[in-house]
UniProtKB/Swiss-Prot annotation:
Residues excised as propeptide: 1-2
Record's subunit section: PSII is composed of 1 copy each of membrane proteins PsbA, PsbB, PsbC, PsbD, PsbE, PsbF, PsbH, PsbI, PsbJ, PsbK, PsbL, PsbM, PsbT, PsbX, PsbY, PsbZ, Psb30/Ycf12, at least 3 peripheral proteins of the oxygen-evolving complex and a large number of cofactors. It forms dimeric complexes.
GO biological process: photosynthetic electron transport in photosystem II
Superkingdom field: Eukaryota
Gene, per the UniProt record: psbC
Family according to the record: Belongs to the PsbB/PsbC family. PsbC subfamily.
Record key words, sorted: Acetylation, Chlorophyll, Chloroplast, Chromophore, Manganese, Membrane, Metal-binding, Phosphoprotein, Photosynthesis, Photosystem II, Plastid, Thylakoid, Transmembrane, Transmembrane helix
Note on cofactor: Binds multiple chlorophylls and provides some of the ligands for the Ca-4Mn-5O cluster of the oxygen-evolving complex. It may also provide a ligand for a Cl- that is required for oxygen evolution. PSII binds additional chlorophylls, carotenoids and specific lipids.
Name of the protein in its database record: Photosystem II CP43 reaction center protein
Membrane topology listed for this record: Multi-pass membrane protein
Phylogenetic classification of the source organism: Eukaryota, Viridiplantae, Chlorophyta, Ulvophyceae, Oltmannsiellopsidales
Length: 461
């Protein structure tokens, strides 16, 4: 029971005594009012979609086609561009109208959701069980809860399949690995081999292994969505048709707050994964839109100066740096030829502008001398000066390169925000899980405050 200074305060006809929660506990007052809780959820969805639409249009209004997206602080347009809308060869933005349409569609959707949220919060029935039993529920009804879980899984699976259909049949998606510097293409042969797809899940998360963040081709990425979309749809059907088994009934706490805690744990995990994915991966998050990764900017610096000095007559194969190690090229711990100097720590980086210059034993000296294309030089010079860790005059986190510009990479925004959100959602999971377990065990949440000294003191003012 929450303790209010003003215990008589009533909001919306629901006071602390009747609900067990103070006014600032918000939707907790609606735990047993399925109709009102539906209104809160729909209105919340409307707010989310409104932000997406409004921010989308804000980015369109401020977008300058002559500058890369990542120099303009954009976080939504890069996502739409990655889906292949309005993009030409090399990641050039050739049409902003699809971005405008996306913003307008989200705004219209938010209006519909907002109306539905207000209707159910203010006008609709307080509970749904009597009038609309299909949409009604009781938190302890285990069969109903797993049915709702199943419906959610089917919707998530359908969402995963939407990306598959877009990539395979409706215009394709942007592939940063397409020949010549990236392009929009149809993914006609996605990977369905379970050994490949689930191999990502079994990889180490450390170093060059990178767990699922190491996906480096669109075939595997779209194939992964085929698998997860299919599994979620079949899992949803399973949960709708079956009742929880005995071990599941005993293992879980079956209450509204428990389900909230499970959801917070899941979204926390997704936040941490999104953090790593947006920071390290340059296939799902193409560098043309999001800027280079940290290792990419560092490798680009080494490549740019190798190109420059090779033109000036340097023997890049044998030149030594001040430490006696290779100035331009050296050997990795496992024998591959890699870039030398400070960037050696990022030797397992892979990027579409660099991979054509590799051979079976790492970087190919003959290719470095004869096959470097102008687009590779331009792109590495651009990435060198746009490190995501960069502050003023910084490349790859090393504050020595005077050609850098002062900007904050979308990768920095996305990785930092998702890490922070993931952390706080995890704390929320612990909080609500503890409360739910305490309630299920039969003891009062919180502490007895009857003897707390502050309750007998005069108000400060």
């Amino acid at each position: 029971m929450e303790t209010l200074f003003n215990g008589s305060l009533t909001v919306g006809g629901r006071d602390q005594e009747s609900t067990g929660f103070a006014w600032w506990s918000g939707n907790a007052r609606l735990i047993n009012l399925s109709g009102k809780l539906l209104g809160a959820h729909v209105a919340h969805a409307g707010l989310i979609v409104f932000w997406a639409g409004a921010m989308n249009l804000f980015e369109v209004a401020h977008f300058v086609p002559e500058k890369p997206m990542y120099e303009q602080g954009l976080i939504l347009l890069p996502h739409i561009a990655s889906l292949g809308y309005g993009v030409g060869p090399g990641g050039e933005i050739i049409d902003t109208f699809p971005y405008f349409v996306s913003g307008v569609l989200h705004l219209i959707s938010s209006a519909v959701l907002g109306f539905g949220g207000i209707y159910h919060a203010l006008i609709g029935p307080e509970t749904l069980e009597e009038s609309f039993p299909f949409f009604g529920y009781i938190w302890k009804d285990k069969n109903k809860m797993t049915t709702i879980l199943g419906i959610h899984l089917i919707l998530l699976g359908f969402g995963a399949w939407l990306l598959v259909w877009k990539a395979m049949y409706f215009g394709g998606v942007y592939d940063t690995w397409a020949a010549g510097g990236g392009d929009v293409r149809i993914i006609s042969n996605p990977t369905t081999n379970p050994g490949v797809i689930f191999g990502y899940l079994l990889k180490s998360p450390f170093g060059g292994d990178g767990w699922i963040c190491s996906v480096d081709n669109m075939e595997d990425l779209i194939g992964g969505h085929i698998w997860i979309g299919t599994l979620e749809i079949f899992g949803g059907i399973w949960h709708i048709l079956t009742k929880p088994w005995g071990w599941a009934r005993r293992a879980f706490v079956w209450s509204g707050e428990a389900y909230l805690s499970y959801s917070l744990a899941a979204i926390s995990a997704m936040g941490f994964i999104a953090c790593c994915m947006s920071w390290f991966n340059n296939t799902a998050y193409p560098s043309e839109f999001y800027g280079p990764t940290g290792p990419e900017a560092s490798q680009a610096q080494a490549f740019t100066f190798l190109v420059r000095d090779q033109r000036l007559g340097a023997n890049v194969a044998s030149a030594q740096g001040p430490t006696g190690l290779g100035k331009y090229l050296m050997r990795s711990p496992t024998g591959e030829i890699i870039f030398g100097g400070e960037t050696m720590r990022f030797w397992d980086f892979r990027g579409p502008w660099l991979e054509p210059l590799r051979g079976p034993n790492g970087l190919d000296l003959n290719k470095l001398k004869n096959d470097i294309q102008p687009w590779q030089e331009r792109r590495s010079a651009e990435y060198m000066t746009h490190a995501p860790l960069g502050s003023l005059n910084s490349v790859g986190g090393v504050a020595t390169e005077i050609n850098s510009i002062n900007y904050v990479s979308p990768r920095s925004w996305l990785a930092t925000s998702h890490f922070c959100l993931g952390f706080f959602f995890f704390v929320g999971h612990l909080w609500h899980a503890g409360r739910a377990r305490a309630a299920a065990a039969g003891f009062e949440k919180g502490i007895d405050r009857d003897t707390e000294p502050v309750l007998s003191m005069k108000p400060i003012d």
